[in-house]
A protein has these predicted regions:
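Helix-turn-helix
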Residues: 11, 15, 19-53, 57
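Amphipathic alpha-helical linker/stalk segments
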Residues: 56, 60-84, 121-131
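Hydrophobic alpha-helical connector segments
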Residues: 71-98, 143-147
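Alpha-helical DNA-contacting segments of helix-turn-helix folds
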Residues: 20, 53-62, 70, 103, ...
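Amphipathic alpha-helical segments used for helix-helix packing
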Residues: 92-112
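N-terminal intrinsically disordered/low-complexity leader segments
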Residues: 1-7
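Amphipathic alpha-helical packing segments from all-alpha helical-bundle domains
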Residues: 110-134, 141-146
Length: 151
């Protein structure tokens, strides 16, 4: 029976996220991740077929973290929910600047299959606006779009 891998896929994804935090997205490569884990690049490429696959795993991790911030904010009871979403978005940018850039400011050309960080939370945002202002879904979507663009 072959030995169990000492470095798990989750560890590699977390190390890749740390590399991005420290060096930005341009610093993400197999050697940097391996150095972070104190190993060769072999575990990276045995768990991920390409660096793009590893990047996608980091995007998924960052999306989950962002979604948890939006939905589990400690400010939820102090402010209207829609305001909390904006506050958490800004807080995320301040606390995780390189992850924020990687998640929201990356080149998305040819990346049609990836979900945006907001795709999971958007229905809740629109519903919150509809309920708070007693407006139609279309009006809530337009308000959100205009707030997003101009604020």
């Amino acid at each position: 029976m072959p030995p169990k891998p000492k470095i798990k896929k989750e560890d590699i994804v977390n190390a890749a996220a740390d590399v991005i935090r420290e060096s930005g997205a341009s610093g993400l490569n197999a050697r940097a991740v391996a150095k972070k884990l104190s190993c060769s690049t072999q575990p990276v490429f045995s768990n991920f077929s390409s660096m793009k696959e590893l990047e996608n795993a980091v995007i998924d991790l960052a999306n989950r973290d962002f979604f948890m911030r939006i939905t589990g904010s400690k400010d939820e009871n102090k402010y209207p929910h829609y305001q909390v979403i904006g506050m958490e978005y800004i807080r995320f940018a301040i606390e995780e600047p390189e992850i924020y850039k990687f998640l929201f400011m990356r080149d998305r050309m040819g990346d049609n299959e990836r979900k945006d960080a907001f795709s999971d939370v958007m229905p809740k945002v629109i519903s919150t606006i509809q309920n708070a202002l007693n407006i139609s879904k279309a009006d809530a979507e337009r308000l959100h779009f205009e707030m997003w663009v101009f604020v």
